[in-house]
Amino acid sequence: MPLDPVALTADLVRCPSVTPEEGGALVLLERILTEAGFDCRRVDRNGVPNLFARWGRKGANRTFGFNGHTDVVPVGDAAAWTRDPFGGEIADGWLWGRGATDMKSGVAAFVAAAVDFVQETPPDGAVILTITGDEEGDSVDGTTALLDWMATEGEAMTVCLVGEPTCPERLGEMMKIGRRGSMTAFFTARGVQGHSAYPHRAKNPVSAMARLIDRLASHELDKGTGHFDPSTLAVTTIDTGNPATNVIPALCRATVNIRFNDRHSGASLIRWLEQEAAEVAAETGVEIGLSAKISGESFLTPPGELSELVARAVEAETGLRPEPSTSGGTSDARFVRAHCPVVEFGLVGKTMHQVDERVEVAQIEPLKAIYKRILKDYFT
């Protein structure tokens, strides 16, 4: 009997797997996949839950991989939800709950597709599923741990599809062939505290920070590249910790986030930020320090065999030719791309991370059909 992706999605939503809790989600999937003949291994690292599953021969020349996550973001105010966020309730044509869109429906669809495919038409090759419980958190011991373990064990994927939600409005509209890089810069300006009536006796870190922020925000990083929109810089915090209106504080902190295309690297942007900070410091006499966190570099899987395989399957099942895009935030594809070519395709993601997160039930079975067709075409 075919594996029902709708029922599996509901079962997964009922698992309260808020990062870093496993919540029973990977235990459920491991049982299903083991019963279907997959070789399953828990690859937990530093308490972070991860699941590896392979059907077929280790080291096969053609190995198709799926990647996804079962961890979810916190519910927030549970009283604000129309339905139980971990109830997996189906009502009004929707399946409700935290993770319904991001991305338990995607995981359920590719698990169901893989199980049905290998049982109905066993391929000459292998199918690997890598599913983590650490995508919404720090992403340090999740997919990276799985890929590290695979390298040690001689396991490899030839290509990989990440089942994150990718479509803006309708299933089939968009797939991701790359992602922008992301980095966060933390600035600390240290001046000299003083009375606001005597500004000449102080060194105002707020004024210095404002000058720096104005320079950064008004600078055009680029005009975009062949497959990427222009890079963006957003100021996300400015803080002095100063409740007094007649005191010039000694300290001011600010944070900016940069989403960057393939014209830049995290290192090149840090060099630019350091130069800008040094120039403002020289102009104002205020010391400005910088630390930065690079969450991921930009990457691109150039249009080719893998993207065409996915596009054909999507068009065959939905009638829509998916637009190849690099928009949006980061995903674990940024880690997979160092292992093998990777493309992302999944459901409409309009309600992910929101109160009353939900997925249209009528989309889940078609997503399974798309994934199953991709497998069939890949191994034909």
From Swiss-Prot:
Cofactor needs: Zn(2+); Co(2+)
UniProtKB keywords: Amino-acid biosynthesis, Cobalt, Diaminopimelate biosynthesis, Hydrolase, Lysine biosynthesis, Metal-binding, Zinc
Sites where the protein binds Zn(2+) 2: 102, 136, 353
Coiled coil: none
EC number: 3.5.1.18
Cofactor: binding details: Binds 2 Zn(2+) or Co(2+) ions per subunit.
Example GO biological process: diaminopimelate biosynthetic process
Active site: 71, 135 (proton acceptor)
Top EC class for this record: hydrolase
Catalysed reactions, as listed in the record: N-succinyl-(2S,6S)-2,6-diaminopimelate + H2O = (2S,6S)-2,6-diaminopimelate + succinate
Binding site for Zn(2+) 1: 69, 102, 164
Pathway listed: Amino-acid biosynthesis; L-lysine biosynthesis via DAP pathway; LL-2,6-diaminopimelate from (S)-tetrahydrodipicolinate (succinylase route): step 3/3
Classification via InterPro entries: ArgE/DapE_CS, Bact_exopeptidase_dim_dom, DapE_proteobac, Peptidase_M20, Peptidase_M20_dimer, Peptidase_M20A
A GO MF term: zinc ion binding
Pfam families for the chain: M20_dimer, Peptidase_M20
HAMAP family noted in UniProt: DapE
PANTHER family (UniProt xref): ACETYLORNITHINE DEACETYLASE, N-ACETYL-L-CITRULLINE DEACETYLASE
Role this protein plays: Catalyzes the hydrolysis of N-succinyl-L,L-diaminopimelic acid (SDAP), forming succinate and LL-2,6-diaminopimelate (DAP), an intermediate involved in the bacterial biosynthesis of lysine and meso-diaminopimelic acid, an essential component of bacterial cell walls.
Protein family membership: Belongs to the peptidase M20A family. DapE subfamily.
Binding partners and assembly: Homodimer.
Name the record gives this protein: Succinyl-diaminopimelate desuccinylase
